């Protein structure tokens, strides 16, 4: 295989806008802007923020989000998970106006997909081969499917968790070779030569390195904050009227762009340092308490 030049891949990778000028004008019409002038757009991370690591959502969190929407504020899911990995009906039963997924690489509003960043297939192939060369185990993440080779995760509980949670949406990298449609990649990195891998792929991706041995490979220039900025542009909303709740490294990007960043009490210290306000942990009514403090409810 010829080595792929990253600048070619980045320029050539398709960015899909699925909203019309008319729709954008509709969302941003003057009357609505006046009505929303004192209202906020609130973005919620999922893991460690809306629910704990057992997928348990506090009743107070559900009440808080429903109450803030009743008060005229908008609520969005904003996750590093790709859309294929956001399927739990308990999440959507809470009620959200839209979804920012895949670290800003996909945006939905009102049940419609309005933005999607698709990675070039040649770049994906090159990246899979490169991360494996350095001892990483990749999971390819798209809007419809995740791709993982089971042999690489046979002794890993995470692989079993994925299979249990998304079932038929989990496909095999090898079986779908060259037919992937994805927007980001995550890699297990326990025994990997990480620095050499990052150096080789640094022109193509930004890396979100977690405390657990996992790294997210996100298209250069994309993160949750860029997704939020696109939402604000499409809604004709001032970004200072945004609030974000999060707990992990991939939430720092959104804390740096929103009006107010709220770190959960269970956040890592580096995340708390980036936040404007630190609430209690997810299972100690953290979202409810912060929403009360910020006068959203």
Segments predicted by a language model, with ranges:
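N-terminal amphipathic/hydrophobic targeting modules at extreme N-termini
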Residues: 2-20
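Short, structured coil segments at secondary-structure junctions
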Residues: 92-95, 102-103, 200-204, 257-258, ...
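Short active-site oxyanion
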Residues: 72-76, 95-97, 183-185, 240-242, ...
